């Protein structure tokens, strides 16, 4: 769960167990396929997922045509396949799964600090405000898992998703 500021008011979060990086996904063969900066998307029609940072971050692109958000990532992917948008906002860590199912897509990622800023650190465990002991235990367990193990676990989860 993303540790957004509004969510922090209602629940407690562990330290992030996986960093969240946002990117844009486009169709191969379009003018955006070789984009290297957010500025390259000036005038592009970009789509996000309703009520998530996959939508809120679109306005960080100057001159963008911010399309009305859709309900889910599969809806976003369908719209990109249909060509009714130029790009969609995605979590970069999920890109391998999207590309496996959609070989005509291209992921555009950006150097650190030059891409979309979701406004939170990453994926965390969310707990009730009253669960302080459990929060401490969860953070202690997460601290025993090094980055290599976390990446392996994430990759295993991605590889076991239905395509």
What is the predicted role of each segment?
Residues 51-61:
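Aromatic-rich, solvent-exposed beta-strand/loop patch
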Residues 8-12, 40, 60-61, 74-96, ...:
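Short helices/loops that flank or line small-molecule/ion binding pockets
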Residues 1-5, 28, 51-52, 72-73, ...:
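Beta->alpha turn/N-cap motifs
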Residues 28-32, 42-45, 49-53, 115-162:
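Extended ligand-binding regions for polar small-molecule ligands
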Residues 48-49, 65-73, 79:
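Short beta-strand-to-loop elements that line the ligand-binding cleft
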Residues 24, 46, 67, 107-108, ...:
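Generic preference for hydrophobic
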Residues 1-40, 106-118:
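Acidic, polar ligand-binding/catalytic clefts
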Residues 24, 41, 80-81, 138:
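Hydrophobic residues within well-ordered alpha-helices
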